[in-house]
Amino acid sequence: MVEWFVCSRTFKIIMHCDLFPTRIYVEQNFLESEEFDEIKLLVKKDKEYLDVPDFAKKVAMHMETICDDLGVDFQSYDSIQVTETWGNVLNKGDGHPVHTHSNHVFSGVFYLTDGNPTIFMEPRPAADCFSLHYKQDSEWFYGSRVTAPAVPNTLIIFPSWLGHFVMPNRTEEVRKSISFNIILRGRYGQPGSLQECRI
């Protein structure tokens, strides 16, 4: 959708549209306090797979709203599935290098404690060839890196192809979170073409 606006100084009509937008969804207070206290106790070791069906079901329900916002045609898909969840435990000196989540459509992080933020990378390599100085609140729109603070009981969902990392923990406080991957079960690609597949 193209939005039009008038520049107040020159009175010229300028076209404004967001090309190739990347949406990141953030929800604070995702779980009720009792649920949050229970799930915090489950994360004991780094990269340990978790069996949390109630959490996964709630994430899948939120994905329905997100897919609707993105204009995804649900008739092409059978279900939304959280394929795996695992704990992240970052002690002093630990971090996560830049990575993506292969073979999935969406991924996410759920913060159990505060600590270093998740930093998302600009996915277009040439976009930061000329770096301007932006106001702090413009980072989400124009920065080459976007910082998502680690706030306990906050859920962040993002495209799996979006590179992200966490700087090494410089404190004695342990940073804990839960990561997860999501797939839409159903048909992908152009129907009737050699590129069509069913997942």
Q: What are these regions, as identified by a protein language model?
A:
Residues 88-157, 184-197:
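Catalytic core of non-heme Fe(II) oxygenases with the double-stranded beta-helix
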Residues 96-99, 164-171:
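Short beta-strand His + acidic residue motifs that chelate non-heme Fe in jelly-roll/DSBH
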Residues 172-182:
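A short alpha/beta connector and helix-capping loop motif
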